[in-house]
Amino acid sequence: MAGIDQLIINSAYREPTHHWKYDLNGQTFIREEGRRPAGYFIAGQGSNQYNDIGQFIELPLVNRIRPRVKAWREAGYPGVTGVTRKLLDHWNDKDARQYPFFYCQMDAIETLIWLTEAPDAEKVGIDIPSDGGAFRRLCTKLCTGGGKTTVMAMLIAWMICNKVTYPQDKRFTKYVFIVAPGLTVKSRLQVLQTGGDDNYYVQFNIVPIGLMDKLHQGKVMITN
């Protein structure tokens, strides 16, 4: 089986321009242009070869959302609130912190903001299925080491700062409930509490100084 001569082919801080695709028949990896399509692999009934990665199942909804979010980003985030714009400008400011946020982190929070704040005309044909419950459920996915807790902090800051500024806007909330899958994770997520200086909002400069007082008016509860 032919291997990969250059494993890292993209910058962690920009949208991927290429990806590796595995060809089972040729038992080789092919470098293809563009971002890897969203999807997952499942083992087929005849998948007993050690090098058979299984059947690829595309996530068409995600692949429709991605170019919409990209176009919205490049257009300057039309439709967002003043608070959201301040946060986005702050997060995109390369001089605001030693290390910029990863592309996957910005893409995740931008997608959630787009689904919530972008004009309805931009979301025609994008229907997020409901599970029938009382709450709207949205999901983002990041790999191990991708900075999921940081994205959670960005999400919390976006919600709380908007709700405090626009208390009548039902799209936002200043109360955050986090359920952790165990005591260890619960302990690690204490960095999402908004009080004090030993939190991610301060460590990663997620909230500009002018919005910090608004963040402190929110309440975060973490349990397991």
Language-model segments: residues:
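RecA-like P-loop NTPase motor core of helicase/translocase proteins
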Residues: 1-224
